[in-house]
Curated annotation (Swiss-Prot):
Its main location: nucleus. It comes from Caenorhabditis elegans. It is found in: Nucleus, Nucleolus. This is Ribosome production factor 2 homolog. Residues 28-232 form the Brix domain. PROSITE patterns: BRIX. One of its GO terms (cellular component) is nucleolus. The keyword Nucleus applies. One of its GO terms (molecular function) is rRNA binding. GO terms for biological process: maturation of LSU-rRNA from tricistronic rRNA transcript (SSU-rRNA, 5.8S rRNA, LSU-rRNA); ribosomal large subunit assembly. Belongs to the RPF2 family. InterPro entries: Brix, Rpf2. Keywords: Nucleus. Transmembrane segments: none annotated.
């Protein structure tokens, strides 16, 4: 736990209020940390990831000799200090070269963590497409049968979506969708990251024709080590506050198109007892018998 002294300034009080638990949490920030040793590949890859996550980022400039799979306490403590729930650690060693460790925390403890080794890397500077706009909302896509068949890969895919989803927004207009991040599970141990920019072209119809231009970075990973939370802790982390849950309404359902269908129960009505307005035009008039045509007076 991080020791917090008594706050004496208004700015310090605002910081504590911003870090406190909320019904609607703030957008998740990512902490970028370099291990004891890094190389050019790790440095450039982390710079590309840093540009993709801005402005929800915090960087630790110094090298840190963290061994997360032996002791995750330092990174959890650093996350509490900088108010970040996501982190990535870049390291390079003889036994485990070119490794990026992605992780996330929950309630002051480690939730999920996966060590991915870079097998191939192409920087975003090698692509001619326009780069990602600061603060834009990306579209994250998971493809591959391993994300559904393998339990660990399914959790790693969930971690990647949580890591790269960007700020929370209610709606995104078509022209505002500028980035598509695709994670492809080649098998249970290999993962590919590709980043594209949608290009809206003219078409014969009102709907534009969409083409994808790769904008980078392009990274292929091999899953090395992983430390995933148990089902009970993961379920607790995904639990929604009661204040955000909609109350169930009786006799109300929703079809596949989003239309609400309701059923109203009405008792038997006795129309004879209903007092209606009596209008002269609607009054019954007595029938007058017509005289026969051949009648003689």
């Amino acid at each position: 736990m991080v020791r917090v002294e008594k706050i004496k300034t208004k700015k310090g009080k605002r910081v504590l209020v911003n870090r406190a638990s909320k019904t609607v949490e703030n957008d998740k920030k990512a902490l970028f940390c370099r291990g004891a040793k890094t190389n050019e590949i790790i440095s450039h890859a982390m710079m590309d990831l840093f540009d993709m996550k801005k402005p929800l980022t915090t960087k630790m400039d110094k090298h840190n000799p963290y061994h997360l799979f032996e002791d995750e306490t330092p990174i959890v403590r650093a996350g509490s200090k900088f108010d970040t729930s996501l982190f990535v650690l870049g390291s390079n060693s003889k036994k485990k070269p070119n490794c990026l460790t992605f992780g996330r925390t929950y309630d002051g403890q480690l939730l999920d963590m996966a060590e991915l080794r870079i097998t191939s890397y192409k920087s975003s500077s090698n692509f001619e497409a326009a780069k990602m706009t600061l603060g834009s909302k990306p579209c994250v896509i998971l493809e591959g049968a391993a994300f559904e068949s393998d339990g660990d890969m399914k959790r790693i895919g969930n971690l990647m979506v949580d890591w790269f989803r960007g700020p929370k927004v209610d709606t995104v207009r078509l022209e505002g969708l500028e980035t598509v991040i695709v994670f492809t599970a080649l098998d249970e141990t290999n993962l590919a990251l590709r980043v594209y920019r949608p290009m809206l072209k003219k078409s014969a119809t009102a709907t534009p024709r969409v083409e994808l231009a790769e904008m980078g970075p392009s990274i292929s990973f091999e899953v090395m080590r992983k430390k995933l939370a148990d089902d009970a802790l993961f379920k607790l982390a995904c639990k929604k506050p009661k204040a955000l849950m909609k109350k169930r309404r009786k006799n109300l359902s929703e079809d596949v198109f989003g239309n609400q269908l309701a059923r109203v129960h009405v008792g038997k009505q006795r129309t004879d007892d209903i007092q209606t307005r009596k209008v002269k035009a609607l009054r019954k008039t007595p029938l007058v018998e017509a005289a026969p045509e051949n009648a003689i007076e």
